[in-house]
Design a protein with these regions (language model features):
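N-terminal prepro-regions of secreted/extracellular proteins
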Residues: 1-90
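Solvent-exposed serine/threonine-rich low-complexity stretches and specific carbohydrate-binding patches
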Residues: 128-141
């Protein structure tokens, strides 16, 4: 009986290992194919748009209280915005007479590394997202810039500031250049 246990236990272990490897062969094969570039599947493209770093200074004129939870002021064809401890906010509507707006902003946060801005067009009964207008700004305190073009000069738009968490707050400022009213 002792000799039988010595033979049976290693055989059972080998069978268990072979069964486990057999059930994993498709997964292992897919991993190897991906690593060697022979995969049949197409990887989803990352379409995240990041605002580009800029060394240009950011001046937010017309803001009475820069420590306000949220404040905005339209000055010299610019919409200047500060936010302190928000989850999300949206601006009032404005137009883009030249069909393009340039956004410069910065941010800091308690536990997230980015926040996002997106443009919405005013339509009957509400607002419609402007395709391709979402940009992410890192919350490292540095200034970042992006431009959104192809806008209808006769349409009204608003900007949404938000991030993908309700656990933490974001702090920062934005300057939206190229606006009217």
């Amino acid at each position: 009986m002792k000799n039988a246990k010595r033979v049976i236990i290693p055989v059972v272990i080998v069978l268990v290992v072979l069964l486990a490897l057999n059930s994993c062969k498709d997964t292992l094969g897919a991993v190897i194919d991906q690593a060697t570039g022979k995969a049949d599947t197409v990887q989803e493209e990352d379409t995240t748009q990041w605002a580009e770093p800029t060394s240009d200074p950011l001046s937010l004129e017309g803001i009475g209280d820069p420590s306000a939870k949220y404040a905005a002021a339209a000055v010299n064809s610019c919409l200047n915005i500060v936010f302190n401890g928000i989850w999300s906010r949206q601006t009032d509507y404005f137009t883009a007479p030249n069909g393009v707006i340039t956004i410069t902003g910065y941010g800091t946060a308690e536990g997230t590394q980015k926040y996002k801005i997106a443009l919405w067009r005013k339509v009957d009964g509400g607002a419609q997202y402007v395709d391709g207008s979402t940009y992410y700004i890192k919350t490292d305190g540095q200034n970042y810039r992006c431009s959104i073009g192809g806008l209808d000069p006769a349409a009204s738009y608003r900007l949404t500031i938000s991030y993908d968490s309700s656990r933490y707050y974001i702090y920062g400022g934005l300057k939206v250049e190229g606006i009217a009213g």
